[in-house]
Design a protein with these regions (language model features):
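A short, Lys/Arg-enriched amphipathic alpha-helix from helix-turn-helix/homeodomain DNA-binding modules
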Residues: 1
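Flexible loop/turn connectors
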Residues: 4-100
Length: 100
């Protein structure tokens, strides 16, 4: 419905590269072009972002570091059940490609 409306969105920011690729397919199916009509940005930084056409701009997150850190925090909590909760922040990177 949004793609057929008189006032369409300028851009889509998807919660994953997979959903962004689906949005690009829906945009093309509606006879519109990415990024000329609607820009698209994904999130994850997966290999899929380089395989779609046009290549997908994405927010790359350090997935392996997130996994390692989560396991370390879990093991620490198992060994020290009374340990306070920890908040961990990790860097991300915007990868500019042709979709936005």
């Amino acid at each position: 419905k949004l793609l057929q409306a008189d006032v369409r969105p300028d851009a889509v920011f998807a919660v994953s590269d997979t959903l962004a690729a689906g949005a690009m397919l829906a945009i093309a199916s509606a006879g519109l072009k990415t990024p000329e009509d609607i820009a698209v940005v994904g999130f994850d930084g997966t290999a899929l972002a380089e395989m779609v056409s046009p290549p997908l701009s994405t927010i790359e997150q350090p997935s392996q570091d997130i996994g390692r850190t989560a396991v370390g925090l879990l093991l620490n909590k198992i060994d020290n059940p009374d340990a306070p909760a920890q908040r961990v922040m990790m860097d991300w990177h915007y990868i500019s490609r042709l979709s936005a």
